Amino acid sequence: RYDSIRDSVFRAHPWNCLIRRQDLAQSSTNPTFGYAHQYPLPTDPYCLRVLEFSNGSMSYPQDNMKNNSGGPAFVIEGRNIVTDEGTAKIKYVARITDPNEYDSGLIEALSMRLAAEMAYAITGSTSMVQITTSAYDQSLKEARFVDSTEGATRRIEASDFIEARY
């Protein structure tokens, strides 16, 4: 049960300590229809959630990439990315099993989620479940905020919409 709870907390936010980048190797089998290429998702470390997809010159979601027919630039099917792009690079949330690599906020959130999951079995109290679930929600909120504000801030480019306000 620990593994599924851990993975759920990992997928809840793009934690900086869990983000990895990788060039994907094209599969020897192509999709039957719809897209030209297929790329297996990374297994070492295991990919839990794709955050960005790039063909080397454009990225999704930043450049709002589309395929030649105007559809999505890529689709995740099972443990594969299918796309028309001949090159595939991704930024993803990885399953990191060494807790020494976790941010302190992530550790706190994961601990609170585990406490919420075990509360009834240990205490037999539904109010304790509510208390620990609320504590998890609060710790997750705080950890996400701190994690998302670390590092360089993204510059918002001026557009006609933004310029119209001034």
Model-inferred region functions:
Residues 1-166:
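Glycine-enriched, solvent-exposed interface loops adjoining structured elements
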